[in-house]
Each structure stands twice: as structure tokens, then as C-alpha cells.
Curated annotation (Swiss-Prot):
The modification Phosphoserine is found at residues 376, 380, 436, 474, 487, 490-491, 497, 624-625, 628-629, 872, 879. The modification Phosphothreonine is found at residue 445. It is found in: Nucleus; Chromosome; Cytoplasm; Cytoplasm, Stress granule. The modification N-acetylmethionine is found at residue 1. GO terms for cellular component: chromosome; cytoplasmic stress granule; PcG protein complex. It comes from Mus musculus. Its main location: nucleus. Recruits the ubiquitination machinery to RNA polymerase II for polyubiquitination, removal and degradation, when the transcription-coupled nucleotide excision repair (TC-NER) machinery fails to resolve DNA damage. Plays an important role in the activity of long-term repopulating hematopoietic stem cells (LT-HSCs). Is a regulator of stress granule assembly, required for their efficient formation. Required for proper brain development and neocortex lamination. The lineage of its organism: Eukaryota, Metazoa, Chordata, Craniata, Vertebrata. Residues 133-145 have a biased composition (Basic residues). It comes from the Eukaryota. This is Ubiquitin-associated protein 2-like. Gene3D superfamilies: DNA helicase RuvA subunit, C-terminal domain.
Amino acid sequence: MMTSVGTNRARGNWEQPQNQNQTQHKQRPQATAEQIRLAQMISDHNDADFEEKVKQLIDITGKNQDECVIALHDCNGDVNRAINVLLEGNPDTHSWEMVGKKKGVSGQKDGGQTESNEEGKENRDRDRDYSRRRGGPPRRGRGASRGREFRGQENGLDGTKSGGPSGRGTDRGRRGRGRGRGSSGRRGGRFSAQGMGTFNPADYAEPANTDDNYGNSSGNTWNNTGHFEPDDGTRLDFIGVEGSNYPRKFETAPGAWRTATEEWGTEDWNEDLSETKIFTASNVSSVPLPAENVTITAGQRIDLAVLLGKTPSSMENDSSNLDPSQAPSLAQPLVFSNSKQNAISQPASGSTFSHHSMVSMLGKGFGDVGEAKGGSTTGSQFLEQFKTAQALAQLAAQHSQSGSTTTSSWDMGSTTQSPSLVQYDLKSANDSTVHSPFTKRQAFTPSSTMMEVFLQEKPPAVATSTAAPPPPSSPLPSKSTSAPQMSPGSSDNQSSSPQPAQQKLKQQKKKTSLTSKIPALAVEMPGSADISGLNLQFGALQFGSEPVLSDYESTPTTSASSSQAPSSLYTSTASESSSTVSSNQSQESGYQSGPIQSTTYTSQNNAQGPLYEQRSTQTRRYPSSISSSPQKDLTQAKNGFSSVQATQLQTTQSVEGATGSAVKSESPSTSSIPSLNETVPAASLLTTANQHSSSLSGLSHTEEIPNTTTTQHSSALSTQQNTLSSSTSSGRTSTSTLLHTSVESEANLHSSSSTFSTTSSTVSAPPPVVSVSSSLNSGSSLGLSLGSNSTVTASTRSSVATTSGKAPPNLPPGVPPLLPNPYIMAPGLLHAYPPQVYGYDDLQMLQTRFPLDYYSIPFPTPTTPLTGRDGSLASNPYSGDLTKFGRGDASSPAPATTLAQPQQNQTQTHHTTQQTFLNPALPPGYSYTSLPYYTGVPGLPSTFQYGPAVFPVAPTSSKQHGVNVSVNASATPFQQPSGYGSHGYNTGVSVTSSNTGVPDISGSVYSKTQQSFEKQGFHSGTPAASFNLPSALGSGGPINPATAAAYPPAPFMHILTPHQQPHSQILHHHLQQDGQTGSGQRSQTSSIPQKPQTNKSAYNSYSWGAN
């Protein structure tokens, strides 16, 4: 879904540049055009057509007339485009807004378009142009919105090549990352499925930061890219379009990484991962042997020399030992992680893992450097660096540097940690051996050396030996600490070296990756284990991981297998830039089984996390979390709280994850890291990667479980963490979409972080964790966790509610929950909700909610309450009350609060027994209001019979007040405004006041999101209309007449109800459907009346995030 969505958006944005161009062209003679338009506007001859179009637009899109008119106007009367604009999110609006800025760039943009026609040559030219344009100035340009936008547009052009997604990404606010986008676009060209939009969240999340911070800090790789972009860019240009892209691509890669949440991002990442693989090649440099790796090898060598200048010899030696066989594999997986992951994984896993170690170190470096420099670069840089550098650095640096050294380091981490890892590992007894498999997974770094050793089944010795060598290379290898130390240098070196390597790799990538362009992620994801490994994001990688786990399970076979599998995980990780974190996570997933979350999370966090984790599991982890938290925070500026929360949450999670006590202690940091990562991705991307780490994705989740098996806690933790991660991941996708939205979505998921919190709480207990995971997943709509979803729901239901509400917003995850949630909420939550809401007669209230009530109410109502009502309500007595109430309502909404009760009281007074029900129902009067809505749907008669009793009051007040939701029972409508705030919220239940309570929320928060809802006046206006009830009730004083009268309104109301159902519980749910924002609020409101206030705040940010 995400892919399609991304593509559509991309196309939409892709069109935007064209639209913008058109707009620009139009604007050039704008004065005349404006005059013409003014004339047209003044003249009436076009009005018929225009109005017809507007009406058409309104019917099709359901937008406001103003919006439709504006969109139509912007689209110059092009209804189709206007529809797209309205539904796609007004890409044109931005274009128009940007037109002024873009004009300067328009020439370039046009050139870009022209170039886009000549994709290959022009791409290179454009890349060179980008290098020049963006090289030195491009950085400024990047920083400058104009440059970015131009890049974005060009990217959009590229997007055309790339299939449009990049264009979309570029056009979006993510233009900030324009340069990266450009490369992304080109990459997109290489990979039709770029997921440009996917990493957009990250891009926009960290546009400028990425540029400067990127260049300066952890941007090591990025730094080179950015700083050296002119040179590198040129060099890259020589390499080819890819080369030029590379610097940007790094940027893009970060974006793509962020997109990790989306599957599209993975594609970009794969490219980036290829770059990463270049790094890997660097590692392989010792193993430059494979011709296929030649490019990579060269790149790797460069990376090794540059990145691992100090360690390359030892690293290379180790790598040579491991890599000789792995190098080709590694190179291949690295180059084309997606397709070759598994096969190549085996050898590659060593190298790859080395990279991973390196990445971890780099990640750690990023964490350290990122933290230090990350302050500024944290968010985008970290995300990017973590993802890109992580993937690249991981693969390249880890593979090359860490390959031997870091690998050793990792190995040390895993080997040295193997005792503790043993704690982590399910198979403590087999500590070395088991750990070795885990080390393979966990210490993928040693994997290159160690992995092969594992293959050789000398993992303990190798691990130890590897560990030993790394210490010599202590800068990198020395545990995570050294790794971090090294990583700064390494990362820097890597960054500079990687670009060339990546450039070369990129060419290769074009050769190799081109084949897997789109399939690599989107298509291949479901593909073979290798590909699945590549598709770390959604568990495909995990599939590779699963074998790894199995392999891990049996050390002997496992060694080779696990080498592959980890490689697969790792490589796939590396392969998927999105998997960068993912890959880390993927590894870490694999790791997870081994180092458990420490690796897993570390990987997730940053490679650094894993390094820390693995080296100094906890300590590093914490640094990782620190590093990652900056990342996350920056990345999650939106999710900032999330990242913090994630930390707590994840910490708990880590505990949960940490099956072993030692692991647990690490785990917290580890967990926190993943959480941060998730939060960081909040960013769907990071989250995805992060989640990935867990499972690299919700799906990974399952995969992770296998890992989990290996990693006992991992199974619970991995699974749960993965689940959490995956949940977040799913939720993010892209969330978000990564989408931000993914990011915001992520943030929301991270809001869900509560869920994570719950998770963390439950995390302690792996089962709860599972539940939590499930809940997150459910929020993420991870089918995987769905099973536990229930559990999670139970444990984290509130969070889940948020999540679920959010997940639907994160539609990218393809969460059907949106509809299900509304329905679930309507049936399930309503059931629970009404009881919650109605402490009164739950049965009656519920019944009122349900058809039975409609029927039963008519029976009961007529029987007891109805009679009483008929006497008083339908009859003059109630009408009299109504009048009083109406006056009371009219007098003050505050009294209205009382009014509802007074109504009840008076009604009760008049109809004590019967009114008792009615009255309790009445507080549910809101409920009744909703009932009229709700019942209006199925049992309007009953509702109205019931309602008339209420409505007669409502009619008076309602009519008096102009149908403030006349059905609300006069009091309610008024309560809505003022009374409701106190009353509705006071009555957590009154939230029911689906009408009032929700309308309140919707009015304030929701209305923003859902203007229609707002305009609906909280359904007060529409309900009033739909409720011709007041009049129906009023006119039909007797219940029967009222009912009869109500019937017509009821159908009408019913019709409205579907649309406005948010008012009633259905309305709530419906609004959720209608407005994702609403969904969050509504679903939580209805599902969690208790949380209305919290949800309310959460909704504001959360719902918005979701939207």
C-alpha cells in the first residue's frame, strides 16, 4: 500500500513540478492571466461550468466548496487535477507557493525536465550540475529552501525517471534534503520504487541539519558527501549518475533510510546500502578479490584505507581471511543486497557483519560524533547517518574496519559478551558456540571473521581471536568504546572514503541494483529468504534471519548458515539503506537472538548502539541510546517526546528484551535505543529500521521470533521488541511515513510509545511484551502481532487505541484497523465504551446503542419509561419540562450540564421510575443524542420514541438554540459548548457525548483536521438538520408521532450519521475514518473514555501527527 501510495504521491508531486512550471508559465504573463481570470470571475458565463466542476469536486472529494474552488482555480479548471490535488494534499498549492522561489530554479528545473528526458546522460549531467550546483553551493542551496526545492523539483523530474516517487519526495517539504533527493530521484530512476516519499519524513525532518550537520558531524560519510560533494560529486559524476547521486544519495539515503518505514525507502536504501556495501567493499578491500566486488572492492579498499586506515590492515587481514570467500558474497549482497543477500550473506555476513560492527562503531561514532556534532545534526544526521552511515558505515566500515577489527570488537563484544550473551542467549550452555551463532548474528562484525569462523565452527576461538585482533585495532574494535572512538574517525574516514567507494558501488549498483530496482524492496520483500533478508523492513529480512536463527540454533550447520543468514540479515540490512537501521536491526534481530537486544537495539539505534551494546552492552547501549536519542529527538523533533518516552519505554523494553539478566541491564539501554530508534524513526524510517531491528518490520517480527528462539529473551524480547519496533515500524511506515506523517505518525506511534511504555511495563514480562508488541503492531496494524494484538490491546489498549487510531492514519502500514477500529470500536469499543461511559444502566445504554435497545427501548420505553415519557415527555408534562430545560439550556450551557441531569431529575421527577432509565440514558442523553444518531441508523423509531421523550426537551432548547444537536437533549447541546467541557469530560463517560464530548474535541482539535466536521458544527448543525428531530420531536409531541416524525429525520439523520457518525459512537468511529486525526481522537475517546483529556492532548499532536 505504501508503495502505491508513495508512488501516487510521487506522481502527484511529480506532476507538481510540471504544474509549477505551468503555473510559472502562467505567471509570467500572470498580470494578463490574472486579469483574464478576474474577468472570468467577474463574468458569469463560466460560472455554470465552473460551478458544475466545483460541485463535481465537492461530490467526489467531499471537500469544502472553498477548497474545491481554490483547487479548481489552481488547477485552471482541470477537474481531474483538482481532484488529485484535493485528495493528494494540494501538491499544487505548495508549488504555487514555491513558485516565487522556484522561478529562479525553474530554468534549472526545466533543464532538469529536459534532462529527465535523457535520463542516463542528463542524469549524469544533472548530477554534475547538482554537484556543481549542490556541491559547494548546493550545500547552501540545500540549506536554502529554494535550492532544496529546486532539487526537489529536479528530483521530481528525476522522480519521473525514478518513477515519480522521488519527485514527490522532493516536492515535499523534504526538499530540504533536495540534494539527497536528487540522488534519490536518480536512485529512484534506478529503482522505480524509491520510496522517495518514504524517506521524505526523515528528509523533511532533517533537511538543513542533515546538510550541515550531515557534512560536519556524524555526517562523516555525509560530510564527505556534503563537503566533498563538488569533488565527490564530480567524481561521482564521473562514476556516473550514481556517482553524482552518491553525495546526494547519502542525503537521500538518509531520507531513504527514514523512508525505511515505507518499503519504497528500502529501495533507495538498497541503493544506499549498495553504497554501504561499497563500504563493505572497502572492508572487502582486503577481499577486493571478487571482480563483482571490484567496484565495491575498490570502494571498500578506499573505505578501508580511508575509513579504516588504521585498522584496514588488521581488518583487511581479518577480512581477507573471512572475506576472501565472503568478499564476493559480501560485495554482491552489499552491492545488491536485495537479491543476493542470502547467498552472499554467508560470506558477506562476515564482511557485512564487519561492516555492521563498523557501522555499529560508526553508529556509535555517530552516536558519539553524532551526539557531539549530532546536537545540530542529531535528528537528520543521525537518522541519515544512522541509516545511511549506519548502513554504509555498517557495511563498509563494519565490514572493512569492523570487519576484522570491529568484527573482533563485535566478536569481542559477542565473544567477550558471550558469557553475558549466553545470559542473553537462549543457549547459555553453548555460550561460545551458541553465542557464536549469536555472535554471527549479534556480532555481525566478527561475523566477517567470526562468521566464517562460525562457518568453520571455530566461532569461540575465532570470536576470541577476532576479538583479540580488534582490540589491537582497538580504535575500532576496542569494544564499543573504542568503536565509538574509532567510529568518529572511522565514520569520518568512511564518509569520505565511502563516497568514492559508494560511487563505484553505485555504478555497480546500477548494474546490480538496477535489476532489483523496485523489486529489491517492494517486490522482493515477499520474495526469497535472501530478498526477504533484503526486505529487512518488513520481515523479509527476518525470513533470512529465521534461517539464521535456525542456523544459529545448530551451531555447526548454523555457522555457515548463520553466517549466511546473518549476512542475509546483515547484508540485507546493509542492502536496505532503509535497513541501515533496519539492517542493523535486522542484524540485531539476528543479533537479537545473539546479543539480543543489545545488538538488536544497538543496531537499531545506530550501529553504534549495537557496538556499544555488544561491546559494553549496557554502557554502549546507553551511549547508543544517547546518541540515538539525539538522533531520535532530532529526527523526532515531532517525536521528541517519543524518543524520551521511547527511551523509558524501550528501556523497559530492553529489560523485557533482556532475557538474560545481563542482557536486561543492557537491554534497557538497548531497548531504549530501539525505542529511541523507533521513536527516532518515529520516523517510520528509523522506526522501521528500528522496528526492523526487532523484526525489521512487523513481519520481521515473525522472523525475529525465530531469532527470538535463538535469543530466548530475544524470542520474547526480540519478538516483542521487534514487535514494538515493528509496531512502530509499521505504524511508522511509515510511517508514516516514516511519513513521517510517517515521522509524526511515528511520533504518534511513539505516542503509542505509551503503548511502548505499556510495552515496557509489560515488556518486563515477555508475554506482556508480546502483547505490547501486538498492541503496537495492532496500532501499526502489523498482522504479525495481531494475534497478540488482543493481548496488547488488553494491556496497552489505551495506547493501542491511540496506536490503532494512529495506525490507520499510518495507512501506509496498510493498517486496515482504521475501518476495523471504527467498527471494532463501534461494536467492541462501543460495547465496552458504553458501559464505561454509561455507568448508569449499562444494559439500557448499551441496548440503546444497539438494535436491541432500539427495539427494547421502544418496548421498555413504551412500557415503563416510555409511558412515563409519553406522559411527561411526549405529553405536555415532558414538553413542559422541555420548555423549562430549553429555558435552562438557553439560560446557560453550564446549567445545561445540570440540565441534562435536571432533565433527568425533572423527568425523573415527573417520571421517576421510567425517567430514571431515561435520565441515566439521558446523561447518555448525549448518548441518546448519539442514539438518535446511532439508533437513528437502526432503530430510529426507538431512538425517537426514546428521543422524543428526550427531544421534546431538546426541541425546545434545541430549537431555541438552533438545534445545538437538538437530539443532545436540549441540555446536552448546550452542555456541549460549555457544560460539556466540564460535564462531558467530567463524565469520562460523557465522552459519549459522542456528540458533545467528541464534538468538543473535534471542534477544537478535530475541526482543524476535519474542517467539515468543524463546519458541521460538531454535528450540532448537521445533527440538528439530521435531527429534524427537534422539530420532529417537537412537532410529534407524542412519542409515536415523534417517532413517526423522527423516522423521516432518522433516515436523513441516518444518512448523515454515516458521515457524521463520529458524533455518535458510530460517528466517532466514522470520524476516525473520515479524519485520521479524528480517528485517533475518536477512537480513543470512544475506546478510552478515560483518556479523553490525555487523548485530547495526544490527539492534538497525535491526531495531527497521524494526519
